[in-house]
Amino acid sequence: MDFLTNLRFTEGISEPYIEIFEQPRQRGTRFRYKCEGRSAGSIPGEHSTDNNKTFPSIQILNYFGKVKIRTTLVTKNEPYKPHPHDLVGKGCRDGYYEAEFGPERQVLSFQNLGIQCVKKKDLKESISLRISKKINPFNVPEEQLHNIDEYDLNVVRLCFQAFLPDEHGNYTLALPPLISNPIYDNRAPNTAELRICRVNKNCGSVKGGDEIFLLCDKVQKDDIEVRFVLGNWEAKGSFSQADVHRQVAIVFRTPPFLGDITEPITVKMQLRRPSDQAVSEPVDFRYLPDEEDPSGNKAKRQRSTLAWQKPIQDCGSAVTERPKAAPIPTVNPEGKLKKEPNMFSPTLMLPGLGTLSSSQMYPACSQMPTQPAQLGPGKQDTLHSCWQQLYSPSPSASSLLSLHSHSSFTAEVPQPGAQGSSSLPAYNPLNWPDEKNSSFYRNFGNTHGMGAALVSAAGMQSVSSSSIVQGTHQASATTASIMTMPRTPGEVPFLRQQVGYRS
């Protein structure tokens, strides 16, 4: 078969060439050591996603037929020397990939290519292997290949070579090699993909100066910056190398915005590596207008006011009206004081004597400022018959008082009828505690008070004490006690204290 019959040239184009259909992803691929004992994985394509995985691929233009493809690793910078790292995967041997493809495949994809890195002590051995296998796409002099210090072990490129068959069917016609974009080791901080993992806040003052804590993948503290971008405006966050913590955290302060704003403005915040101008995926950052109350005290007061107003509104508008004070009713003083019966009213009324004015008996009583209260309802017992015989209306009040000034006793005073009346109620004998006391008072009355001398002192004390004890258990309007009639007007207050007088 003639060699020219295997070539299908397009009109106007004399030679076939290689074109990269999809570039490999530059960042995100991890170079693995052989000692890790696991697959190096596959190099993803630049358009690969989690749901739709793609891989690096090429196509041969201006040619239709069989072709042999060789893929190797070369250095990032010119001259492109064979790299000491190895390509591993299906179809790989001695650190490179080689396979034949028929005319039915227009696009050639490489799905199982991984990168395996070598140790520094094995670099010379790896380069010697490349030379022995004639893996030198750009024919770099051998002397330059042994310069180990010039190799960057954190970045490689894919080199695609295509060999077409000659008239004997041997793949001896080589097309010009083509290199891909650089592929960076994801473990190396100076070449790894930049990525913002998390920030503690995504907004700040338009004046800048807000402290931001940013978590990221590994970065070089002397080769990283935080950039804020909006259109043609660009600013950088302020931080030093000491603010980069273990290559995975950056503490910086935001730059001020271009000018004053009246509403929030959203800008883009991203990491950038100055050495290769690599940038991360941006995140949103909002600049807020300058607040007159940065501490938020005004907002707190408003929230507190609203918290009180809501329950009041729920209860109704009537609650908010202040109730009017009701007038204080006039209370009769008699309603607040407990009235006790007074044994000595302004007009003293004694049975059998008629009505005696207190001013006649005790002239000093008329000067008392407080008038005694009237007797309340209660049990009213009349005097014994001896008192009716002793105190007739004929004797004067003065002779009666002089006669019984030293030996007398008090009984319960009946409620007087009309003012100035001398009539006595119906006779009702006293309820004496026992027969002994009853006979004593009866004898006392028959002798006109002189019978008291015939009674012993012990008997008098027993009679008096029993009368007092019995009297305390009667109704509140009664008063039973043994007392001495006052001899002088000055003894009236003492008498009132003895009978329980209350103003």
Curated annotation (Swiss-Prot):
A motif (Nuclear localization signal) lies at residues 298-303. It comes from the Viruses. GO terms for biological process: canonical NF-kappaB signal transduction; cellular response to stress; innate immune response; non-canonical NF-kappaB signal transduction; positive regulation of transcription by RNA polymerase II; response to cytokine. SMART domains: IPT (SM00429). Its main location: host cell. The modification Phosphoserine is found at S275. This transforming protein appears to have a protein-kinase activity. This is Transforming protein rel polyprotein. It comes from Avian reticuloendotheliosis virus.
